[in-house]
Amino acid sequence: TVTVAMKADAIHPGFGFLSENARFAELCKKCNITFIGPSAEIIHKMGNKSEARKTMMEAGVPVVPGTKEPVYTVERGMELAKEIGFPVMIKASSGGGGKGMRVSFSEEDFEMNFKTAQQESIKGFSDDTMYIEKYIEQPKHVEFQIMADKYGNVIHLGERDCSIQRRHQKVLEESPCIAISEELREKMGETAVRAAKAVGYENAGTIEFLLDKHKNFYFMEMNTRIQVEHP
């Protein structure tokens, strides 16, 4: 490749799909080229949302009530949705950009929504693995920017309110978030740092939370890269 031919020491993957490609990060390592980002192992662990949920639960980080295992079939999904309690959010484990997500409000619409979300996941991410969460009504989408070095030091750079969305994609970001108190801001920031430390994270990343109307917050996912809107 050009990178090898030019004897580059490092490569920055930008903010697209390549930046979250664990295989590419591993290839850089094999070629003795520094991948400016987290390790392939962390990209894989946090990029798979089912695995990320499990990791955060083990670290004591609050997550949205939901499945602890991957879901592949409508039948198993229905069983788990009944246990969680409707309404539920059906999500693709490898999803992103609002793809592979559907809300199911009852048993009657569950099968249709599950199949639609799973087909989107297969088409967009070549993965049929799903998971199910309790649907948080009237939520706020609040995310924290974190930075981490290779020595285990992690800081956060404050929060953004990303609640104004269209088709599960952010339209507007506000900072600081006026919906949280200074005390809650500190608590959420500390949790974001703890989440990053739990996986030995390095480089820039984003910890995303859902905040319910009672001011309870839950880990939703982690972006293992700089955000596309913050190049």
Report each predicted region and the residues it spans.
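N-terminal beta-alpha lobe that positions the nucleotide/phosphoryl donor
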Residues: 1-207, 211-230
